[in-house]
Structures are given as C-alpha cells and as structure tokens.
C-alpha cells in the first residue's frame, strides 16, 4: 500500500466520521472526489493507483485535475469548487500527519476557489402567488391543509424545513407568532 492509500483510507474511514463528525453523505461526496482524482492521475498523468504516492501529488497536478473537471468532464465552477474543498480538507489533515510534505500541502492549500457567476434570484409575481394559492381544493381536508401551509410559508418567509420542524408547542395563536426552538 502506498502512503497516499494509507492516509486516504484513514482520512475517509476514520478522520471524517470519528473526528470531524461528517455525515455519510459528506464522506460519500469526498470519496467520489478522490475516485475522480485517482482516475485523472491514471488517465492523464499516467500514474496507476498502486503507484500513486503523496510525492506525486503537486499543486500543478491538482490544478490540472481542476481544469480537467471543467474542460473534459464539463463540470460547473460550483462543482469544481466542491471538489477542491474535498481535496483541501485532505491536505489540511495531512499537515498534521505527514509533516515532511508540509510545503507541498501548503502549496495545494493556496489554490483559490473560482468565483461563480452571480445568479439573480427569480421570484413569483403577485399574480403567480395568487394563482398558486388558488390551487388547493378548499372543500377537502388536504386542500385546506395545503392552503394553510402555503400561506404560512408565504407570510412568514420560512423555509420548508423550518415549517416541517414545527411542533404544536411552537405555535402561540394568542400571541400571533411562532416560537422557534
């Protein structure tokens, strides 16, 4: 096993879950990043996984990987930045485990996130909101429920998850406000 394999296994299987408390989904996404990175190193840099040592991973190769994601795989800047975040997390971890390569890790950590184009948020018009609120069938129980939920979302500006997390104890009709816990 290479030093890269050893540290990557520890990073994914122990460090992220036990020390950082990352979710299963985060570990899955970080694993996917490293699968792509290993694929890049093999296909483009011609370094087989069983010959991939930490000394082979340079800032230039990481930049090449990020360029490959955008140009060859047609990933968005946002996806590229997410992949970079996963790599940066690994190299932060390495700073405390493999100090001999500190200069290499810090060079990789100096890679900046790309700016993503600003996306203007679109909103429903007043007519659109009115049309949406007219959709539930108020003669049925589910229709009345849906109408109340949509009205609460609209009036409060709350996120769907915030509404889902509400319990009866949070609602104070006497005071005309909802208490969030």
Residue ranges of predicted features:
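Conserved catalytic core of the tyrosine transesterase superfamily
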Residues: 1-181
């Amino acid at each position: 096993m290479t030093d890269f394999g050893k540290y990557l296994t520890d990073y994914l299987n122990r460090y992220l879950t036990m020390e950082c408390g990352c979710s299963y989904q985060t570990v899955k996404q970080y694993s996917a990043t490293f699968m792509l990175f290993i694929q890049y190193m093999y296909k483009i840099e011609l370094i087989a996984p069983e010959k991939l040592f930490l000394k082979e991973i340079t800032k230039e190769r990481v930049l090449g990987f990020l360029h490959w994601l955008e140009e060859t795989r047609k990933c968005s800047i946002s996806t590229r930045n997410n992949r970079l975040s996963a790599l940066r997390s690994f190299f932060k971890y390495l700073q405390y485990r493999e100090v001999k390569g500190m200069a290499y890790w810090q060079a990789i950590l100096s890679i900046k996130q790309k700016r993503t184009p600003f996306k203007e948020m679109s909103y429903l018009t007043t007519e659109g909101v009115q049309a949406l609120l007219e959709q539930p069938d108020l003669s049925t129980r589910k229709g009345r429920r849906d109408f109340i939920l949509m009205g609460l979302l609209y009036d409060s500006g709350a996120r769907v998850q915030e509404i889902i997390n509400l319990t009866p104890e949070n609602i104070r009709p006497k005071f005309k406000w909802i208490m969030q816990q």
